[in-house]
Swiss-Prot record:
InterPro entries: Mitochondrial_sb/sol_carrier, Mt_carrier_dom_sf, Mtm1-like. [2Fe-2S] cluster binds at C74, C78, C88, C94. The gene is Slc25a39. Residues 1-14, 143-164, 236-255, 339-359 are mitochondrial intermembrane. It comes from Mus musculus. The activity of SLC25A39 is regulated by levels of mitochondrial glutathione via its ability to bind [2Fe-2S] iron-sulfur cluster. Upon physiological levels of mitochondrial glutathione, glutathione prevents iron-sulfur-binding to SLC25A39 promoting cleavage and degradation by AFG3L2. Upon depletion of mitochondrial glutathione, SLC25A39 binds iron-sulfur, preventing cleavage and degradation by AFG3L2. The lineage of its organism: Eukaryota, Metazoa, Chordata, Craniata, Vertebrata. It catalyses: glutathione(in) = glutathione(out). This is Mitochondrial glutathione transporter SLC25A39.
Length: 359
């Protein structure tokens, strides 16, 4: 905060507390994030209209490998499970080669099939990229939120009621812009289970074809998901925490109250912003498309057009694909993160009271 008293904490201490919370949350919640991404990147039907141009935008292709002896055939990485799907060069399906990718019918089914066919470690695929992204991003985000909220309230730029909403939105906007390339990499690792060498080749191909701007593919829907999520989350969190705390002073809010308030707020915000999360996942899955079957990668459609397309192909239900794992993830992850952060702040507050800042 701007004016520190002996019981306050410094921005550096805020960053340490939030960074620790990010590590704990990532270790516990990455499996649910992997399942959510798999369900969202899965197409409505693996065997229907595979060659319709509108379906190519969400798929990633690779050129023929030694596994394909006949010229002109290609291996299609479909639905994020790396199971082969063979197509003739003219786009005609060849049933004699066709191997239907594993389909997930729900959250539990996805957990079981991923563990059975790919191993338990796959549930933590993308964890290194997740930690590299979330630890600094969370540290910046939470520290920026506290600093912005204190500034807005201190300067009377907005009411105390709406200060959390404004501060949360602004803090998240900056964070999304900085970490968007790493978010894209993490999504690719989780959805397609590719090696880091294959991922590097995919990123290099994308930069060659679309320039450095391609690394921010999905920034629009990510911002549309995360900025409103942040605004809704902090607004509801402060309200619920205040209601649960009652007459308890704000600086004495228990970790338990923070846990419950964070879980409730995360659940509400995640539900309202889920359609944008689906669009973000589908758009980022188009990274690395090449002309493996003489199909030129289509132009990137707008977020609203993709929302309409998903609804047309999969119905309203398609806009809420991965609802259960996202909610199951959002509630505990928000609860774990905010309670760990509040615990860390309380720890540093006690430490600073025993040894005042500046000594």
């Amino acid at each position: 905060m701007d004016d520190q008293d002996p019981g306050g904490i410094s921005p550096l201490q805020q960053m340490v507390a939030s960074g620790a919370g990010a590590v704990v949350t990532s270790l516990f919640m990455t499996p649910l994030d992997v399942v959510k991404v798999r369900l969202q990147s899965q197409r409505p039907s693996a065997t229907s209209e595979l060659t319709t141009p509108s379906r190519f935008w969400s798929l990633s292709y690779t050129k023929s490998s030694s596994a394909l002896q006949s010229p002109g055939k290609c291996l299609l990485y479909c639905n994020g499970v790396l199971e082969p799907l063979y197509l003739c060069p003219n786009g005609t399906r060849c049933a004699t080669w066709f191997q239907d990718p594993t389909r997930f019918t729900g959250t539990l089914d996805a957990f079981v099939k991923i563990v059975r066919h790919e191993g338990t470690r796959t549930l933590w695929s993308g964890l290194p990229a997740t930690l590299v992204m979330t630890v600094p991003a969370t540290a910046i985000y939470f520290t920026a939120y506290d600093q912005l909220k204190a500034f807005l309230c201190g300067q009377s730029l907005t009411s105390d009621l709406y200060a959390p909403m404004v501060a949360g939105a602004l803090a998240r906007m900056g964070t999304v812009t900085v970490v968007s390339p790493l978010e894209l990499v993490r999504t690719k690792l989780q959805a397609q289970h590719v090696s880091y060498r294959e991922l590097a080749s995919s990123v290099q191909a994308a930069v060659t074809q679309g320039g450095w701007r391609s690394l921010w593919l999905g920034w629009g829907p990510t911002a549309l998901r995360d900025v409103p999520f942040s605004a809704l989350y902090w607004f509801n969190y402060e309200l619920v925490k205040s209601w649960l705390s009652g007459l308890r002073p704000k600086d004495q809010t228990s970790v338990g109250i923070s846990f419950v308030a964070g879980g409730i707020s995360g659940m509400v915000a995640a539900t309202l912003t889920l359609p944008f999360d689906v669009v973000k996942t589908q758009r980022q899955m188009s990274l690395g498309a090449v002309e493996a079957v003489r199909v030129k990668p289509p132009r990137v459609d707008s977020t609203w057009l993709l929302l309409r397309r998903i609804r047309a192909e999969s119905g309203t239900r398609g806009l809420f694909a991965g609802f259960l794992p996202r909610i199951i993830k959002a509630a505990p992850s928000c609860a774990i993160m905010i309670s760990t952060y509040e615990f860390g702040k309380s720890f540093f507050q006690r430490l600073n009271q025993e040894q005042p800042l500046g000594r």
